[in-house]
Design a protein with these regions (language model features):
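Oxidative protein folding and maturation machinery
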Residues: 1-82
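Generic structural signal for well-ordered beta-strand positions
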Residues: 82-83, 183
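Conserved redox-active cysteine motifs that mediate thiol-disulfide chemistry
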Residues: 88-89, 95-113
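Active-site acidic short loop of glycosyltransferases
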Residues: 88-90, 120, 146, 167
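Alpha/beta-hydrolase fold active-site loops
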Residues: 91-92, 171
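Conserved hydrophobic packing residues within short motifs/helices of P-loop NTPase cores
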Residues: 94, 126-128, 151, 174
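Structural microenvironment flanking redox-active thiols in thiol-disulfide oxidoreductases
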Residues: 106-144, 156-162
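Thiol/disulfide oxidoreductase modules built on the thioredoxin-like
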Residues: 146, 153-203
């Protein structure tokens, strides 16, 4: 009935707000919907929400603009350790992806277009895969002649870098400044036409 639909809707709205980090005045919003929630499982979820809010606030604070991520290291296709600090002096555009993620793969042509469009500018293109099977990742790189700097996050979602940036799903894109500090930990997708214009603005301003 309408009451059940309303209850389902408000629970889903709160869930997505917490997940996406829309935390402004959320405690009051939860208090306002509490009278609409009747189901035991929803009440239990609502009672657990403050813990999730605290975790979300911490993860978003950990990846706030200005946060230094340059100390993190990953493995490249040759098995060498690569540090994000290696790219200091250039902006870093990071693509968090995996070979089994169709939306991630759909962004690859747009990343390549941006690479060509911004060739010669002080920016590097880093793709960090969350594949747990290294061979699958390596085969994909070879088969698709992948460009840019290809790294793998061997611990998947358990890697401290993943926890710090508050990654909840892929693809996710990050932009770091020339010191390896966060400009945006969840920036626009390359397929969004605004992304190219934003990068051009930032890079032209830095020259």
């Amino acid at each position: 009935d309408n009451e059940e639909l309303r209850e389902s809707y408000v629970m889903e709205a709160i869930y997505w707000d917490v997940l996406r980090g829309y935390l402004y005045d959320i405690e009051n919003r939860i208090a306002n919907i509490r009278s609409l929630v009747k189901k035991a499982e929803n009440l239990e979820t609502l009672n657990e929400t403050p813990v999730r809010i605290a975790e979300a606030r911490k993860s978003f604070a950990d990846a706030m603009p200005g946060t230094d991520l340059s100390h993190y290291t990953f493995e490249d296709a040759q098995g060498k350790t690569v540090s994000l600090a290696d790219f200091k002096g250039k902006y870093v555009f990071i693509d968090m992806w995996s070979t089994g993620c169709n939306p991630c793969i759909g962004e690859i042509p747009y990343i390549r277009d941006l690479e060509k469009r911004l060739s010669g500018k002080p920016i590097v293109w880093v793709s960090i895969s969350l594949d747990l099977n290294k061979k699958v990742w390596l085969d994909f790189l070879q088969k698709n002649n992948m460009s840019g700097i290809q790294l793998i996050c061997d611990k998947g979602f358990k890697h401290p870098f993943i926890k710090q940036i508050g990654l909840s799903g892929i693809p996710q894109f990050l932009l770091l400044d020339k010191e390896g500090k966060v400009i945006d930990a969840n920036t626009l997708r390359p397929s969004n036409p605004v992304m190219g214009k934003l990068l051009e603005f930032i890079l032209n301003r830095s020259e």
